[in-house]
Amino acid sequence: MQEKLQAIVAQAKETIHSVSELVHLDEIRVQYLGKKGELTAMMKTLGQLSAEERPKAGQIINEAKQSVQTFLSEKKAELEDAILAAKLAGETIDVSLPGRGLDTGGLHPVTRTLRRIETIFSKAGFDVATGPEIEDDWHNFEALNIPETHPARAMHDTFYFDENTVLRTHTSGVQIRTMEEKDAPMRIIAPGRVYRCDSDQTHTPMFHQVEGLIIEENTSFAQLRTLIIEFLRQFFEDENLKVRFRPSYFPFTEPSAEVDIATNLFGDGRWIEVLGCGMVHPNVLKNVDVDSEKYTGLAFGLGVERLAMLRYGVTDLRQFFENDLRFLKQFK
């Protein structure tokens, strides 16, 4: 019996060693250790032995079964390791391959421009003030020395809710509200959305504006001129930027001026208007109970989209509001 068991174990070892797939390994287990397996059949022959021989024979058969089970376990572990190694080899990361970057978003060019403007003026001591976009007649017109006969009040220029309520046409109303609520001296800028009945290559019904106000003693137009030139040169990062002031008219400032810069945006070095400014009209100060004998004011207003167009080389203002990602992704 012992010789037969040794032959079975040797054959099992050889067969197991030659297996290359787990499914075949299970077939071999059934062949030797299953209910009808060769070693199981050997156990059934113990009844043919004498009582003295059975313990020794049973021990030998069990040792043979354990040997075969050990071969099977070792081979199974070997095959599983090979399968895992092959899988890992197929999934190896090539660290020399450039990573795939996330498609991150970015600030809208108008937002970037607004933040740039706020940063520059904050360095000059200006606070940021805000106010409602739906404005009453007093804050949008009357307090700013704009009479009922002024063209800006016309229906084709202003969006009316009723005869006394409008979508604000400028952020100057924020200046009025601030002067009503706070005492001079003050320096503020009022950024925000404004609305006018206008739409073409350089105008949209809704756009962004920043208006600035200084109420202090002994202000002068020379101070205003220096402030604006310095702002424009910082904004465009050009210390040699050409800036000119032209006499103009605004109901809420006197004297008033429009400011142009020389630009090659259209390829011809033309002068482009970028903002309006002036000394705050005494009537405006009177309307908000500011002592015009003690204080004088400087005011300016600029279109954010206009500055964004000039800074980024955009020739059609409407592109800022069409939500075309091909356009907007340029400004990340």
UniProtKB/Swiss-Prot annotation:
Record's subcellular location: Cytoplasm
Enzyme Commission code(s) on record: 6.1.1.20
Catalyzed reaction equations: tRNA(Phe) + L-phenylalanine + ATP = L-phenylalanyl-tRNA(Phe) + AMP + diphosphate + H(+)
Presence of keyword Nucleotide-binding: yes
Ligand binding (Mg(2+)): 254
This protein's UniProt keywords: Aminoacyl-tRNA synthetase, ATP-binding, Cytoplasm, Ligase, Magnesium, Metal-binding, Nucleotide-binding, Protein biosynthesis
Cofactors demanded by this protein: Mg(2+)
PROSITE patterns found in the cross-reference section: AA_TRNA_LIGASE_II (PS50862)
Principal cellular location given in the protein's record: cytoplasm
Molecular function as annotated in GO: ATP binding; magnesium ion binding; phenylalanine-tRNA ligase activity; tRNA binding
Quaternary structure and partners: Tetramer of two alpha and two beta subunits.
Protein name: Phenylalanine--tRNA ligase alpha subunit
Organism placement in taxonomy: Bacteria, Pseudomonadati, Pseudomonadota, Gammaproteobacteria, Thiotrichales
Name of the coding gene: pheS
